[in-house]
Amino acid sequence: MARIFITGSTDGLGRAAAQALIQKSHQVVLHARSSERAVALDDLAPWSAGVVIGDLSSATDTRNVASQVNALGRMDAVIHNAGAYSTKGRSPTPEGHPTIIAVNALAPYVLTALMARPRRLVYLSSGMHREGSSSLRDIDWSARRWSSSQAYSDSKLYLTALAFAVARRWPDVLSNAVDPGWVATKMGGASAPDDFEEGYLTQTWLAVSEAPAATVSGRYWHHRRPLPPAKEVDNPAFQDQLSARLADMTGVSLF
């Protein structure tokens, strides 16, 4: 059985993925943003391999999450499921970054760099990454007029490119991005039309399946089908420029 860490596992896709993996006797390490949010895991925690707590919008907390997971031992897979979408403006983090950018892009980058390297990495993307801006001059939105939807698209472009960069730079790791579709979660809303089950089962499939179709790297998946991502995602020059910018913003070097 595999050991899997899932960020953002108190609700939505992350919780569903955790439940599915626990039911198959995998060792799942859960994550909650705060002790208060961890109460939502009370029913799963006894069957899990541990619960780590930390707010991924905070650089300090994100580093601490990496330390907590490392203390539990090397994971076989990490599912970077946690995400944020805010319509309340830039919502700066303690370090001054927009919360959307911090949670959706900076935190997965830092966790990837600081956690013991797993065999598999799964990053939760979105079809909205195709509307992301390829300009990396104002990742922090310090000059642009704020747009939550554009910032979200940008963050998912960065995250998807990160998944492909890891696939290229770490050939011993299976790294993939997943578009779960527009599904009924707290973020997606109750009327979202896509298949919720396929949204989380694609994550778990990539995390643990030994099927030949799942043991590949550098792919963008939607409901267990590979799709072409935005052109920037598979561009080594863009990947390297993004990695350099994220290293500069976080003070953490990945490659």
Region roles according to the model:
Residues I4-G8, H31:
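Conserved N-terminal Rossmann-fold NAD(P)-binding element of oxidoreductases
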Residues T10-G12, A18-Q19:
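N-terminal Rossmann NAD(P)H-binding glycine-rich loop of SDR-like oxidoreductase domains
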Residues K24-A40:
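Conserved glycine-rich Rossmann-like NAD(P)H-binding loop of the short-chain dehydrogenase/reductase
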Residues A45-T60:
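Rossmann-fold cofactor-recognition segment
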Residues P46-W47, Q68-H80, S86-P92:
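A glycine-rich helix->loop->beta "capping" turn
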Residues G83-P92, P98, R120-D172, D179-A192:
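Catalytic loop of short-chain dehydrogenase/reductase
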Residues A105-L106:
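Ankyrin-repeat alpha-helix packing hotspot
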Residues A177, P193-A244, D248, V252:
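C-terminal helical subdomain
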